[in-house]
């Protein structure tokens, strides 16, 4: 409400101690905190009575964002647009999540680091409380420059954006079912990295580390399948029978 655009985050106590802790002692503040806590609890539990499948899928993808700034941004959106019962317009919320995903992913490429993202996000927070649609109008990307950055970016496994990108790609498929947020997923090299190091059967290691050779995969499967040839991996991807019963395959449709 104060339209603060500064990217320097004010200390929590300093913010609330103004006017003799008037804001902190307000009944409305406590009620708003309860509503916000309930919202995030339902996000965490993937409450299908509160959110549509398409919204829950976008929230799953954002859970693997390269940083946590989207959560603060979403909190501001919720507090401004919630109905009296704490609900949101589903289609409008879905559009907001899609725009947020696109911007956060792209900005992580062109301006890496959490601190740099604060400037456009804080400015857009002000637009939200003014009732304006999220558009990031003052932070448009140059298409050719962005393509150059994307094409030259090294998507190593240690970089958070790598898992962000392949999670987003997996959920671009309408056939991809919603997975639990408690599922531990890792990055799978479809052509195993260890096989390349042993056999040197590809022309370049860059091919092994390219996005096209990577997919998200549940940790329980990735541990078993990590060093196998693709023909052997399919057994673990699809699931198989053992004397003790069936071993489930991956839920990743890709």
Pin down the residues of each PLM region.
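A cross-family structural signal marking well-folded subdomains
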Residues: 1-164
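Betabetaalpha-Me/HNH-type nuclease active-site subdomain
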Residues: 122-253
């Amino acid at each position: 409400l104060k339209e603060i655009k500064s990217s320097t985050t004010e200390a929590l106590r300093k913010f609330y101690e103004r006017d003799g802790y008037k804001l902190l002692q307000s009944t409305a503040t406590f009620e708003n905190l309860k509503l916000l806590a309930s919202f995030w609890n339902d996000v965490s539990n993937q409450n299908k009575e509160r959110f549509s499948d398409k919204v829950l899928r976008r929230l799953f993808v954002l859970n693997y964002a390269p940083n946590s700034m989207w959560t603060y941004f979403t909190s501001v959106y919720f507090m401004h647009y919630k109905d009296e019962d704490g609900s949101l317009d589903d289609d409008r919320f879905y559009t907001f999540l899609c725009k947020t995903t696109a911007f956060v992913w792209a900005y992580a490429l062109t301006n890496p680091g959490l601190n740099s993202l604060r400037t456009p996000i804080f400015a857009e927070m002000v637009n939200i409380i003014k009732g304006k649609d999220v558009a990031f109008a003052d932070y448009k990307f140059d298409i050719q420059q962005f393509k150059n950055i994307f094409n030259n970016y090294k998507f190593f496994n240690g970089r958070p954006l790598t898992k962000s990108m392949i999670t987003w790609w997996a959920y671009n498929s309408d056939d991809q079912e919603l997975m639990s947020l408690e599922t531990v997923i890792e990055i799978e090299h479809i052509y195993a990295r260890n096989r390349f190091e042993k056999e040197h059967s590809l022309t370049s290691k860059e091919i092994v580390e390219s996005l096209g050779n990577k997919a998200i995969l549940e940790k329980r499967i990735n541990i078993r399948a990590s060093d196998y040839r693709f023909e052997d991996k399919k057994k673990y991807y699809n699931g198989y029978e053992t004397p003790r019963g069936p071993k489930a395959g991956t839920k990743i449709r890709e």
